Amino acid sequence: MTDRAEQDAALGRRLFVAIPIPSEVRDAVTALVDGVRGAGDPAVRDVRWVRLDGLHLTIRFLGPTDEDNVADVAAAVDRTAGRRPPFDVVIAGGGAFPSVARPRALWLGVAEGATDLAATATALGDALADVGWTRDDRPYRAHLTLARSDGVRSGPAVARRLIDAAAAVREPFRAESLVLFESISGGGPARYVPLHEARLA
């Protein structure tokens, strides 16, 4: 077990709530990333790419959570899903946070569905507040994280390559459920294990 994994285990289970990406969109994103990573520049390997089998749109990151609180979080997910209808999402374009010049995260954007995603995040925040969680007042920014590049010298170049490759990306899907995931670190990119799923009403 890595130091990070040991710390997380001591603090609780690292949880987040997200909308899963369907397999057909995941396949298209995987092809895009494979193209960027296979461009022949060894600098691309310096960027820490996420596991593509666990792609998701994060609604709320909860962080280390005590085992006694997991059931309350799952209930909040159920209440949120029961109040939100399914909606359409379009993944399109790429970018970097906080900027291409100094990227910490590389991502694909949301061309349609951002308002519904933000409303879902607000509804989940309300449901979590009812069971004792602090509200997250930061603006919700819908995106699909593909890589972490903080402190990597080649980050800006890889960000530009991803943005160029993503210019033609337009992948629609129907958001139909909310999933409570556990993030398990150690031995490479984190694995995302679904703990609870609730269908949107």
Regions from the language model: what does each represent?
Residues M1-A201:
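Histidine-dependent nucleotide/RNA phosphoesterase domain, centered on the 2H-phosphoesterase fold
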